[in-house]
């Protein structure tokens, strides 16, 4: 089997996992994203997962499978934020897959956001993708962003209680947040529930997927608000990470 035929078969399997298939334009944007990440990676260290199925499975599939609910209604207009976007993923993959969405990518590291801004420009997404260089704790307290998003996502940023404090304040009353996790167990669920009780949130669903080629099991935890998040969250810069809300004394420190 030629490499081209092998890749085509693997690509088909990826879309089968998602029960969704990109349009020719979207597929071209994914290919262009891979090219741009490769180019920028020669200048700064964005990600090692660029070539072959490191990109298509560990980046594109892993970015999109947790939002299969949204892929079913890809023409719906929604407002999305990707917290701790790093090299621009999962946010850019989601923005490409949901062509009527408006997406905000946020990271505190300037060299990464500078590269991501250029990638957004080259992809032709400037009209609906915004890149911010800022600490999440500060953005989450700004009126412009607080309680304004339909979907908040984060991948490989922090433990679940910390992620919840980052994500919940961004949500509209009807919004949901999706935490992309590798490890997930009963203890982490218990810790998350403690944090959500303070944030006025709840767990909606938990799903898992074993990535092809033995690339590991991934988990997607969807959470939402039961009422507006209390104004004191997220706390000051660095505090959510140092004193996560599953710690009973965290609010007093």
From Swiss-Prot:
<keyword id="KW-0949">S-adenosyl-L-methionine</keyword>
<feature type="binding site">
    <location>
        <begin position="136"/>
        <end position="137"/>
    </location>
    <ligand>
        <name>S-adenosyl-L-methionine</name>
    </ligand>
</feature>
<feature type="binding site">
    <location>
        <position position="84"/>
    </location>
    <ligand>
        <name>S-adenosyl-L-methionine</name>
    </ligand>
</feature>
<dbReference type="GO" id="GO:0005829">
    <property type="term" value="C:cytosol"/>
</dbReference>
<keyword id="KW-0489">Methyltransferase</keyword>
<keyword id="KW-0963">Cytoplasm</keyword>
<protein>
    <recommendedName>
        <fullName>Ribosomal RNA small subunit methyltransferase G</fullName>
        <ecNumber>2.1.1.-</ecNumber>
    </recommendedName>
</protein>
<keyword id="KW-0808">Transferase</keyword>
<feature type="binding site">
    <location>
        <position position="89"/>
    </location>
    <ligand>
        <name>S-adenosyl-L-methionine</name>
    </ligand>
</feature>
<comment type="similarity">
    <text>Belongs to the methyltransferase superfamily. RNA methyltransferase RsmG family.</text>
</comment>
<dbReference type="InterPro" id="IPR003682">
    <property type="entry name" value="rRNA_ssu_MeTfrase_G"/>
</dbReference>
<dbReference type="GO" id="GO:0070043">
    <property type="term" value="F:rRNA (guanine-N7-)-methyltransferase activity"/>
</dbReference>
<dbReference type="Pfam" id="PF02527">
    <property type="entry name" value="GidB"/>
</dbReference>
<keyword id="KW-0698">rRNA processing</keyword>
<comment type="function">
    <text>Specifically methylates the N7 position of a guanine in 16S rRNA.</text>
</comment>
<dbReference type="InterPro" id="IPR029063">
    <property type="entry name" value="SAM-dependent_MTases_sf"/>
</dbReference>
<feature type="binding site">
    <location>
        <position position="155"/>
    </location>
    <ligand>
        <name>S-adenosyl-L-methionine</name>
    </ligand>
</feature>
């Amino acid at each position: 089997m030629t490499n081209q035929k092998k890749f085509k078969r693997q690509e088909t399997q990826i879309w089968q996992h998602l029960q969704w298939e990109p349009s020719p334009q979207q597929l071209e944007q994914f290919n262009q994203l891979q090219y741009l990440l490769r180019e920028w990676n020669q200048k700064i260290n964005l990600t090692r997962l660029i070539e072959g199925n490191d990109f298509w499975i560990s980046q594109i599939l892993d970015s999109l499978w947790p939002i299969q609910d949204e892929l079913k209604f890809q023409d719906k207009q929604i407002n999305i934020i990707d917290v701790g976007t790093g090299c621009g993923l999962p946010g850019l993959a989601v923005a490409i897959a949901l062509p009527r969405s408006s997406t905000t990518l946020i990271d505190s590291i300037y060299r990464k956001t500078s590269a991501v801004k250029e990638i957004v420009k080259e992809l032709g997404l400037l009209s609906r993708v915004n890149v911010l260089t800022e600490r999440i704790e500060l953005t989450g307290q700004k009126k412009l962003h607080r309680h304004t998003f339909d979907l908040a996502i984060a991948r490989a940023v922090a433990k679940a209680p910390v992620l919840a404090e980052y994500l919940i304040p961004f949500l509209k009353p009807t919004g949901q947040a999706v935490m992309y996790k590798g490890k997930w167990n009963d203890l982490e669920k218990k810790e998350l529930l403690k944090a959500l009780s303070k944030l006025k949130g709840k767990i909606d669903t938990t799903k898992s997927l074993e990535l092809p080629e033995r690339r590991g099991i991934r988990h997607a935890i969807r959470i939402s608000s039961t009422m507006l998040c209390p104004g004191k969250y997220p706390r000051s810069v660095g505090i959510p990470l140092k004193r996560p809300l599953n710690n009973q004394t965290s609010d007093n420190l």
